[in-house]
Regions:
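Interfaces and regulatory segments of ATP-dependent nucleotide/adenylate/phosphodiester-chemistry enzymes
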Residues: 1-64, 207-245
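Short, charged/polar micro-motifs that form catalytic or ligand-binding hotspots
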Residues: 4, 8-11, 57, 74-82, ...
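Generic structural hydrophobic/aromatic packing signal, biased to beta-strands
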Residues: 18-22, 71, 123, 136
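Alpha-helix initiation/capping motif
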Residues: 27, 63-67, 144, 172
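Structural motif
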Residues: 29-33, 78-83
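A short mid-domain helix/strand-loop element embedded in enzyme catalytic domains
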Residues: 43-73, 81-93, 98
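Short, flexible active-site loops
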Residues: 68-77, 133-137
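Catalytic core segments in nucleotide and nucleic-acid processing enzymes
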Residues: 86, 91-245
Length: 245
C-alpha cells in the first residue's frame, strides 16, 4: 500500500493516515509493534460495528409456529446467554404490557452480575405501583440445585413470591428429585417457583397474545438487542431471521 494510489481514493484523509501507520510499522520492523497496531485496528473496527444501526424488517403477519421457528434458529448460535435473555425479556415485556400485568420489566447487560446491578435476578417485573412482583432467572445451561438454592436465598430477603426459572436446557438429571423437593419447600414458605423453558412458556404466551402481540414481540426483541448493545452478529442474525418470515 503506497501513496501512488491516493488519487483513486474517495477518502484521501483516512488513506493518508493508513499509509502513515503502515509505513511506521514497516520502518520499526518489530513484531510487537505490528501486533499492537493490528489489535488497535481490530478494536476500532469492532467499536464501529457495535454502533452500527440495524434495521429489523418486522413482518406484516407472523404465525405462532413461525415465531417459534425464528426463536429456535436465533438460539442455535451460542451467545453466552445474551440471545436467550433478549428473547425472555421481550416476552415478559410484551406480556406485561399487553395484559397490563407489569408497568416495567427491568434487566441489565448479560455481562453484569445481579449483585453489581442491584437486581434480584436477570429480570424484575414491576407492577403499576413500582413494586417488584415477579422475578425471572434466565439460564442458558442446565439448572442445578445449587443454583436454585443460591438464587432463592437472595430472593427471600426481598419478599417476592413469584419466581420463574427459564432453564433453556432443563434441569440437571442428578438434581431433578432434589429440585422438586426444594420447589415444594419454597411453596410452603410462601414462594411460588416455576421452572420452565422459553418455548413451553412462549408457545402459551404467544398464543394468548395473538398475531398483533407476536408482532410486538419480534419488534421488542430487536429493541432489547439494541438497548443493551448486543453484539452486531446477534442483531444482524435477528434481522435476517425476520426477513426470512
Amino acid at each position: 500500500m503506497t501513496k501512488k494510489y491516493r488519487k483513486q481514493q474517495k477518502n484521501k484523509k483516512d488513506w493518508d493516515s493508513l499509509c502513515r501507520v503502515l509505513a511506521e510499522v514497516q520502518e520499526r520492523d518489530d513484531p510487537q509493534v505490528a501486533s499492537l497496531a493490528l489489535k488497535q485496528t481490530l478494536t476500532e473496527v469492532y467499536r464501529r460495528l457495535a454502533g452500527a444501526h440495524v434495521v429489523y424488517p418486522t413482518p406484516k403477519r407472523i404465525s405462532l409456529e413461525e415465531t417459534l421457528r425464528i426463536m429456535r434458529a436465533f438460539l442455535e448460535q451460542g451467545s453466552g446467554g445474551d440471545r436467550l435473555l433478549a428473547l425472555a425479556s421481550a416476552l415478559f415485556s410484551v406480556v406485561g404490557s399487553r395484559f397490563k400485568l407489569f408497568r416495567e420489566v427491568r434487566r441489565s447487560n448479560i455481562t453484569a452480575s445481579d449483585a453489581s446491578t442491584g437486581l434480584m435476578a436477570d429480570l424484575e417485573c414491576l407492577n403499576q405501583a413500582g413494586e417488584v412482583v415477579v422475578v425471572v432467572e434466565v439460564k442458558d445451561r442446565v439448572l442445578t440445585i445449587t443454583q436454585l438454592r443460591t438464587k432463592m436465598a437472595d430472593i427471600r430477603e426481598k419478599q417476592v413470591s413469584e419466581i420463574f426459572f427459564v432453564a433453556h436446557q432443563g434441569v440437571a438429571d442428578a438434581d431433578k428429585e432434589e429440585i422438586g423437593r426444594q420447589v415444594v419447600h419454597e411453596f410452603v414458605s410462601g414462594h411460588n417457583v416455576y421452572i420452565t423453558d422459553l418455548f413451553a412458556l412462549g408457545r402459551t404466551a404467544l398464543s394468548l397474545l395473538g398475531e398483533p402481540g407476536r408482532r410486538d414481540f419480534v419488534q421488542e426483541v430487536g429493541r432489547q438487542l439494541d438497548a443493551y448493545r448486543s453484539d452486531i452478529t446477534h442483531r444482524r442474525s435477528w434481522a435476517q431471521l425476520l426477513a426470512s418470515v
